[in-house]
Every structure is written in structure tokens, then in C-alpha cells.
């Protein structure tokens, strides 16, 4: 028998639906899969070429569990310059995607029963990871009427002696909203006053369509109470390469490195050198293309009378539906061959998530089918 804690953890709903859509496509069905949490662009050619070059050298060996020094140094330099922070490579740990960076952070910080505050709608893997690490979860709901912006007052009201961290995700998955500077400033002050960590997942920070984006690093003085999470999957279309990273105090980074040394040993060596090259690659063409797609989907859904908050980042649009969102997605896939993710997967029933990480041509066809489906209900 498998352990109780694993039995109680659901499979990732987004991964499950993505696999279901791909299975139908493999059978020859004309399914438009808008569940994907990954860019549809190929990995930039210079990155692929660097991986090939490194493979041909034949030096594919274990690396430091924290990641190769050159990559940690490059990340520290880039993030340090962007946010005017003095960051040492020893504060950086390279991980198997940002997802492992998050899991390692929870494992490093949480004792049994420690609480993490999260905001709903919430990405599908946060809560299972916290539970697997022995923590408990307190969910703060956000609302479309308030543009899915979190409330500092609600956070303060929920703080208890076992609160170890507050987890934020901006730009947000699934809503696409960007958290306001005033909230982040207040959260930093509160963390210092009440002695908790802020874990900030900013994996979509390179895909922003507003001038108002604020990172937690813009408003924090240092890394004593901060764990910053990012990666290369979304910024450089490297989802399958599995390279993410964590930046925090040296104390937290050392703890995370210890975990990694006993789990994965290190990150794929070839992927690390590919990521090092990616630091030199401009991704502005991706941002512009996603912005055009976002604008297209927004205008089309407005004409359809659909209610939503316009995304400011990432590549998702989270819109309201009538009735059961799970049945909505099941019927849409069955009748119109369009795959979306129900809001219930993000603890927000009554909504669905659409990914616009595909071509305008396919988005046009998908929205035509969705409109037909809505009109037939």
C-alpha cells in the first residue's frame, strides 16, 4: 500500500487534462489544447546549439548540487542588476524547474504543522507540495470584483503562531493579474514585524504587458525573510529542459542545497549550460507575440459577453462560466474539441482557464467553437 499522505494528494489537474487532450490528438481528433502552461515557441536556437556543443565535448558529469558556479554567478548578476541587490552566487540554487525550487523551499522551511498562507485562485501544485512537506495551508480568497488583488488586512487577520510563510505568485497563474506595489510593501513590513517568510514565485515576470509590475525584490531590503523563485521554462520556452532557481539568504540556500544533494544530486548538466547561454538571449519577440495574442483573446471574449479580469502578465485568461465549471470543460472537450482547465482545479469554481500560448489561427478557431458552445447552452 502507498502512504496515506501520497494517497491524499491529487494528480496535477493541469497535467492530467493536458495529457488527455494530447491523447485525443494522437488518436486523430482535431482537439485545440488550451490547457498548456508552456510557450509554443521552440527553444531559442543559440540555446540548443550550446547544448549540442557541450554534449560533443563529452564532459557530462555530476555538478555541484547547487548548480554550476557560472550559472549561479550569471543569475546572481542578472537579478542583482535588475533589482539593485548585492547577490552572491552562494545565495542561488539551481533546481529541476521552478517547481522543484518551490518544493525544496517548503522542505527547508517547514516543520510539521507549520502554516503557509496562499491566495485563491491558487496554482494546482502549491497546496500538495506544502502538505507533502508537512505543512498546513490557510487560503485567502481573492475576488474578480476586486481584480483578484489580495488583501493585506485579511493576511494580518489570519497570522497565527504557526504561520511560517506567505506564498505569492505575480504575474499570477491562473488569473494573469499583477500584485500591486502597495500590497507587496505592506507584506514586507508585516513579514518583518511578525517574523514569517515571503515565498515569491515570479516565473512569469518576463511576460508582462503593463508598466506597473513590481517584484518582491523591488520592495525588500535583503533576503532575510525572502525566498525568490524563478526559472527558464516560461522566459525562454525551455519547459522540458527543467531549469529553475531559488535565491534567498545563504542559510536557506545551504538548506535547499542539502535537500538537493540527497534527492536529485544535481541538475542535468547539459541543461545548465544551455540555461547559461539563455541568459544572453533576448526574449522580447515572445513578449510581443503573447501581447498580441492576449489583446486578440480579450477583444473577442468581450464581444462574446464573457466576464473576466484582463491579464497583465503570463499567458492565461481566467473567465467566468455559468454552472459547474468541471462539467463545462468536460462538455466543451467532448462536443467542441477544445480543452480548458476548470477553475475548481485552482480552488475557484465557476471559472475556467484558457491558455493563449498558441497561434492566432488556432485561437480564432478555438474561440469560434467556444462561442458556438456558449450559444447552444
Swiss-Prot record:
GO BP: any one term: biosynthetic process
Compartmental location: Cytoplasm
Name recorded for this polypeptide: Aspartate aminotransferase
Subunit description: Homodimer.
Gene Ontology cellular-component annotations: cytoplasm
Cofactor(s) required for function per UniProt: pyridoxal 5'-phosphate
Domain of life: Bacteria
Pfam families documented for this protein: Aminotran_1_2 (PF00155)
Family in the record: Belongs to the class-I pyridoxal-phosphate-dependent aminotransferase family.
Keywords from the named record: Aminotransferase, Cytoplasm, Pyridoxal phosphate, Transferase
Positions annotated to bind L-aspartate: 37, 123, 173, 353
Gene designation: aspC
Chemical reaction(s) catalysed: L-aspartate + 2-oxoglutarate = oxaloacetate + L-glutamate
Keyword Nucleotide-binding: no
EC number(s) from the headed UniProt entry: 2.6.1.1
PROSITE patterns: AA_TRANSFER_CLASS_1
Annotated GO MF terms: L-aspartate:2-oxoglutarate aminotransferase activity; pyridoxal phosphate binding; transaminase activity
Residues modified as N6-(pyridoxal phosphate)lysine: 234
